[in-house]
Amino acid sequence: MSRRALISVSKKDGIVEFAKKLEDLGYEIISTGGTYNLLKESGVKVIKVSEVTGFPEIMGGRVKTLHPKIHGGILAVRDKKEHLKDLNDHGIVPIDLVAINLYPFKETISREKVALEEAIENIDIGGPAMIRAAAKNYKYVTVLVDPVDYEKVIEEIKLYGDTKEETRFYLAAKAFGHTAFYDSLIYEYFREKTNMEFPKVITFAYEKVQDLRYGENPHQKAAFYKNPVKSYGIAECLQLHGKELSFNNINDANAAIELVREFSEPVAVAIKHTNPCGVAVGNSIYEAYLKAYEADPVSIFGGIVAFNGKVDVDTAKELVKIFLEIVIAPDFEEEALEILMSKKNLRVLKLKEGYYREFDLKKVEGGVLVQQKDEIDLDESSIKVVTKRAPTGKEMKDLKFAWKVVKHVKSNAIVLAKDGVTVGIGVGQVNRIWPTEQAIKQAGERAKGSVLASDAFFPFPDVVEAAARGGITAIIQPGGSQNDQLSIEAADRAGIAMIFTGIRHFKH
């Protein structure tokens, strides 16, 4: 008795060769629509699904395979007498292999300004039903959703007369993943068009970009996945030069890109272990980089530098003077790129324009925390001067600069800035005075005349008192402590201007 295969694919890579090999191995081929036409034109003896079902394709192809003679053939358990009786009574022929991939929903919604009606017409109904049926009945049916598996299946059939059960189980798992991914894309597309910000059930579809050499540490396996439709940022960077990106490279580069995005004026950002170690704005990218380097010439070594403008020759010449892991920018002058590429191991990334507002996810054991991204802008109307002295124009400019930076520093965080440059950064301490002392110590003499930004309020006046001793002249912080008045009084005694934003920027 010949075996039967059902083939219906939107991605037709390798499908003709696969069908011909199945035919040579004694399989009867049934198919639908465009796949049927392609196979027939290519010389494959193929039967139309409508000939099997005795029912024509209707509604413009919306209904083709949703029929007992198809699903009964796929789902029949071959060693159950009642199933075999049903097959015989209703003239249903078992289907032993199903090769299907689905309507191009992802590709459709990835295009700009796609009408809802077009997206809906690219939601596959019959395909997922057949895939799931075949995967459920993996003990008897081989299901293929990926052309990469065609050759393995052919080889096993040649060797054993059928695929091995362990192979069918693996392919079934892959098939269920395929339909789950497909349904997640559809769900996310529809969810975005509603007000379901935090729905009862949430799914996210990501596809693998690459396997990584290892994770955060060499003993951890890792891979990188991206949003297949609304991808941006590090996931869409074009690598122009250098070694393959590591797990830590990607994580650090992401932090650099997020901080760079805060600024419209030319900015240079140096990142180490996801924290900024030097940030500066300037009249040009070149000036910004020189200032960012001088902010902390020790920590920048082995770090990542990102820009929001085209890297020129002068900047490239400065960049190659030290060891850096990555340089990121939206563009590079041709000669500048050649200079950077002279460093064999330097990774050079071109940042793609565009941004998509999505959830911020934090994995915890047994669950996931979902929140809006911390993207609130500092509203001028929310700035409240709480001290007797208001900041000068220069101080206010530096305060706003420091406020943008402190948002991207691990809490508890303090940033000192002067003339559009960070001069001291206190990172990730368990109280607020320690990062203050850390930042002041790093700044040294540069602390005098600088401003201070804090990601959260001051529970005690000790931060203000330390700032006064360091020569800091202005402070920006959220406010909201029950001891705010003590900090205000300390600032007034020292002649420090202080403003409250009403916004906290914890980062964990």
From Swiss-Prot:
Q: Where is the MGS-like domain?
A: 1-145
- Which Pfam family would be a valid example here? AICARFT_IMPCHas
Q: Does the keyword Transferase apply?
A: yes
**Can you quote a single GO CC term?**
cytosol
Reactions catalysed, as given in the entry:
(6R)-10-formyltetrahydrofolate + 5-amino-1-(5-phospho-beta-D-ribosyl)imidazole-4-carboxamide = 5-formamido-1-(5-phospho-D-ribosyl)imidazole-4-carboxamide + (6S)-5,6,7,8-tetrahydrofolate; IMP + H2O = 5-formamido-1-(5-phospho-D-ribosyl)imidazole-4-carboxamide
Q: What are the UniProt keywords, alphabetically?
A: Hydrolase, Multifunctional enzyme, Purine biosynthesis, Transferase
Q: Which InterPro entries match?
A: AICAR_Tfase_dup_dom_sf, Cytidine_deaminase-like, MGS-like_dom, MGS-like_dom_sf, PurH-like
A GO molecular function held by the record? IMP cyclohydrolase activity
Give the metabolic or biological pathway.
Answer: Purine metabolism; IMP biosynthesis via de novo pathway; 5-formamido-1-(5-phospho-D-ribosyl)imidazole-4-carboxamide from 5-amino-1-(5-phospho-D-ribosyl)imidazole-4-carboxamide (10-formyl THF route): step 1/1; Purine metabolism; IMP biosynthesis via de novo pathway; IMP from 5-formamido-1-(5-phospho-D-ribosyl)imidazole-4-carboxamide: step 1/1
Q: Which GO terms describe its biological process?
A: 'de novo' IMP biosynthetic process
User: EC?
Assistant: 2.1.2.3, 3.5.4.10
Its family remark reads: Belongs to the PurH family.
- Entry comment, domain topic: The IMP cyclohydrolase activity resides in the N-terminal region.
Q: Which named protein is this? A: Bifunctional purine biosynthesis protein PurH
Gene symbol? Answer: purH
